[in-house]
Amino acid sequence: MDFFITNGTRLLEKELTAGSGQITYDVNKNIFGLPILKRRENQGNPTLFPTYDNYSHILSFIKSLSIPATYKTQVYTFAWTHSSVDPKNTIYTHLTTQIPAVKANSLGTASKVVQGPGHTGGDLIDFKDHFKITCQHSNFQQSYFIRIRYASNGSANTRAVINLSIPGVAELGMALNPTFSGTDYTNLKYKDFQYLEFSNEVKFAPNQNISLVFNRSDVYTNTTVLIDKIEFLPITRSIREDREKQKLETVQQIINTFYANPIKNTLQSELTDYDIDQAAN
């Protein structure tokens, strides 16, 4: 079996052979490669194949299974970690950064880590009171939208409400839409998870250490909230223009409901100035 490693200066191949120890030599061939993407601001152009300092995934786990048969068969499975994952939870300015909720460094007494359903890539946080995640911003100033991927069994009348506190940023808050029914969350499907985004953008300074504290502010303790991950979406010009377009379309749809006959622009008789002001805001 061949293993490819890096010693920080070049890519090496380690060949393990029974009874003969290890042989290490430089790699001058490529059998297959996962996609190589630009993952840092100071990194050069993307390359077709992995190099010692430009690779997309790191081998993190191997498992083998022996299948009894006339000719014994050995099956191997490999688990990979994306190279953008790091202990500092670095938030990148040019990519959407995903941070698993289980990388939180502080959990409230009522919250806990629970096993994931198998399609989330890891475990989840059963969010009952609060948790904190510490991140490191990269070396450029940037504004972001922050969103979470979650599952919740709240109803229209018992929706969970969460607040996000970040030093130097006005507190953010939102109510979570229910995504599944019942109390059993051990076998949730992919469709039972949704994204929800905080409405206001946040701005981080270069190389800033950031603490994000999530709190539940509702009183519905029986409402389950499972947090999968937190995402930071860098706000580019195109994203901002797209959001403004969506906002205008939403306002137009609301305004259309005010007219008894949209073609003739006839306002409903019971419409008030307050309704119009709310639509404008």
Curated annotation (Swiss-Prot):
InterPro entries reported in the protein's UniProt record: Galactose-bd-like_sf, Pest_crys_dom-III, Pest_cryst_cen_dom_sf, Pest_cryst_dom_II
Pfam families per UniProt: Endotoxin_C (PF03944), Endotoxin_M (PF00555)
Family (UniProt): Belongs to the delta endotoxin family.
Disulfide topology: none
Source species: Bacillus thuringiensis subsp. kurstaki
Domain of life where this protein originates: Bacteria
GO terms (BP aspect): sporulation resulting in formation of a cellular spore
A Gene Ontology molecular function term of the record: toxin activity
Function: Promotes colloidosmotic lysis by binding to the midgut epithelial cells of insects. Active against Mamestra brassicae.
Taxonomic classification: Bacteria, Bacillati, Bacillota, Bacilli, Bacillales
Keyword terms of this UniProt record: Sporulation, Toxin, Virulence
The protein's name: Insecticidal crystal toxin protein
Region (Antigenic epitope): 54-78, 91-104, 108-116, 131-148, 160-172, 189-196, 208-216, 221-236, 247-256
